[in-house]
Curated annotation (Swiss-Prot):
The protein, known as: Insulin-like growth factor 2
Signal peptide: 1-24
Propeptide residues per the UniProt entry: 92-180
Annotated GO CC locations: extracellular space
Region (D): 86-91
Amino acid sequence: MGIPVGKSMLVLLISLAFALCCIAAYRPSETLCGGELVDTLQFVCSDRGFYFSRPSSRANRRSRGIVEECCFRSCDLALLETYCATPAKSERDVSTSQAVLPDDFPRYPVGKFFKFDTWRQSAGRLRRGLPALLRARRGRMLAKELEAFREAKRHRPLIVLPPKDPAHGGASSEMSSNHQ
């Protein structure tokens, strides 16, 4: 005859929920905040430098800064590159100006967060698109706890013996020998 309306609606809702989960898995979103955002911007923009707000030519009346876009919303490599500064001089001009600097000129990192490994990790995550659960610190902790729980469950003994109670366990054999 036909499938009842209630069952068909249930199947439709389940398949819709499954489809939404699959779509969310294929669209990874990366959020970067604080030092990790600065490190990633320094890595992506390298010697060009970067802005925390977009240049005035692209800005509208209510433009969001990179912190609002990357820390509170999803952030990808293309968005980060829009905040890179354009080089002021051509490559030829830069090479001649560097020759003027003395050799003992101090070349310190500009910025508090100068960790190349952190740059590579953040930019690598942006390129790879790891699941959001593994990217978040809280998610990594939950994953470790889950793995520890599974490991403990795997090594659980088959039979748990009760602890010996002196009133019942050890004393009963002595008392029975005294009564005989």
